[in-house]
């Protein structure tokens, strides 16, 4: 019940008074709207710490989003998965239209709640043009952070069977492959390219959509060519990004192991900036 959840949080905070924000990792925090609305009201009155949580688009209302902001939500996580409506309906069984997603995102932008989206790249029958729709939808809803994940066909799931019947699952052990599916219309280097440069292009399409219409259309077409053009050096760009990621990870490991206090301080500054950004 909401009462028990609040009691648990109070007990936790009494034992750990240094906690400055809370990240609710419930898979779908607003699955039961009545429960969620009551919890938010109690959380605002009795806890009031900045917080984040996982949210579904199709069971939200503007009033709930406003309550979330008032209660201390500064970021929400949501599964966008694919920007191609047909892919969402046919393969993911997520019956959320583009219009529904865009309208909900307007509420988060209106009340100053940052958006983090989870996205899937390399779904069966996807190609780079459909993947680009995912980038563009993130730009249209003004996602603040994005997490692109490469699709993995878990045995026993409908998408595994679809992939197997289509011949996209290679023979032998595919678990160590960076891109598990082998699809002629969406080769490995293109999947890795989209994953690596996902947020880079989301930011640039945001610029395009913020420009005057005519100029924005020209810039958008230029960006389209940079993503899907026949002369894009996908393999080289993936190799370059891999080197950059390796260097960044080495620096992170160094800070964690040699300068842990500095690392924790930097993490806290990062979270506080995100919270302040949405105030």
Could you tell me what each predicted segment is?
Residues 36, 131, 160-161:
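Histidine/acidic-residue-rich catalytic or RNA/ligand-binding cores of hydrolases
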Residues 64-66, 124-140:
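Catalytic cores of alpha/beta
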Residues 1-118, 136:
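Radical SAM [4Fe-4S] cluster-binding motif and immediate context
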Residues 56, 83-92, 105-130, 149-155, ...:
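Conserved strand-turn element in the central/C-terminal portion of the radical SAM core barrel
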Residues 158, 175-279:
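Radical SAM enzyme core and accessory elements
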